[in-house]
Amino acid sequence: MSITTLNIMVAFTMALLGMFTYRSHLMSSLLCLEGMMLSLFMLATIVSLNMNFTISFMFPVILLVFAACEAAVGLALLVMVSNTYGMDYIHNLNLLQC
């Protein structure tokens, strides 16, 4: 395992720990999710370059598309919750249930 791969795995682990630690605000959770997706994208790119298969070059692009969709939906949810309730606490999200 190279030092680059180890650093990317540490970045993913730190983002995952941040997701568990800073789960009170929606914005903090979204930033941690983006950090996790970025580290997964970098790891998938390095792995696909090392595999030398042409079909594996599509996986990082597909992962990046899903990350962009996740960010758009998360920001739309953040705007909706902050406009409706005036704050972005996650414990207030259960108020959205019927």
Swiss-Prot record:
Keyword annotations for this protein, in alphabetical order, are: Electron transport, Membrane, Mitochondrion, Mitochondrion inner membrane, NAD, Respiratory chain, Translocase, Transmembrane, Transmembrane helix, Transport, Ubiquinone
Enzyme nomenclature, EC number:
7.1.1.2
Q: Where in the cell is it found?
A: Mitochondrion inner membrane
Query: Where is it mostly found?
Result: mitochondrion
Question: Is this entry keyworded Transport?
Answer: yes
Record's keyword annotation contains Lipid biosynthesis: no
For this protein, the parts annotated as crossing the membrane are 1-21, 29-49, 61-81
Q: Which GO terms describe its cellular component?
A: mitochondrial inner membrane; respiratory chain complex I
Q: Which InterPro entries match?
A: NADH_UbQ_OxRdtase_chain4L/K, NUOK/Mnh_C1-like
GO biological process terms, semicolon-separated: ATP synthesis coupled electron transport
Q: How does it sit in the membrane?
A: Multi-pass membrane protein
The protein's superkingdom reads Eukaryota
| Reaction catalyzed | a ubiquinone + NADH + 5 H(+)(in) = a ubiquinol + NAD(+) + 4 H(+)(out)
Instruction: Mention one GO molecular function.
Output: NADH dehydrogenase (ubiquinone) activity
The kind of enzyme this is, by top-level EC class, is translocase
What does the protein in this record do? Answer: Core subunit of the mitochondrial membrane respiratory chain NADH dehydrogenase (Complex I) which catalyzes electron transfer from NADH through the respiratory chain, using ubiquinone as an electron acceptor. Part of the enzyme membrane arm which is embedded in the lipid bilayer and involved in proton translocation.
Q: How does it assemble?
A: Core subunit of respiratory chain NADH dehydrogenase (Complex I) which is composed of 45 different subunits.
Q: Which family does it belong to?
A: Belongs to the complex I subunit 4L family.
* Name of the protein: NADH-ubiquinone oxidoreductase chain 4L
Q: What organism is recorded for this protein?
A: Ochotona collaris
Q: Which gene encodes it?
A: MT-ND4L
